[in-house]
Amino acid sequence: MKTFIVGGTGFLGYYTCLELLRHGHKVSTLAHMPPPDELDFPQEVKLDIADMNKISDEDLLAHLQAADGLIFAAGVDDRVVPKAPAYPFFYAGNVSATERVMRLAKQAGVKRAVIFSSYFVACHQMWPELKLSESHPYIKSRVEQIEAAKR
């Protein structure tokens, strides 16, 4: 299977690359940052360094058209503390980015997709009475990200 990873040089993306290669997949990735020097990034992975939010739909579509599967291992996480109000920042980085990639993946004929989100989504689903998505804009964006991916 040919798999395209958005965010393949981050922690989850990097280890996903390794695991996919181990299972015989062909892997390509679009990453915002080059891999850290201390990582032995696999030469078999086609690596393109670019900000997915700044490249054109046509360029992103070209990556997706070469893939059977997509893994979205990008977005902004809760370690980032944006200026108030925080929700628009998290929405743009998680929900809008996912909507765009999934729309283009569908257009490209990608057969399968996996979204790496957050353990907060699992907590939100397990304990809805806590209303976690109402208490933090990051959690809200990750819950909405999953819904956006399903559309």
Walk through the language-model features, giving the residues of each:
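NAD(P)H-binding glycine-rich loop region in Rossmannoid oxidoreductase-like domains
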Residues: 45-46, 50-95, 122-129
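Conserved beta-loop-beta element that borders a ligand/cofactor-binding pocket
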Residues: 151
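Short loop/helix-cap segments at secondary-structure boundaries that form the rim of catalytic
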Residues: 36-43
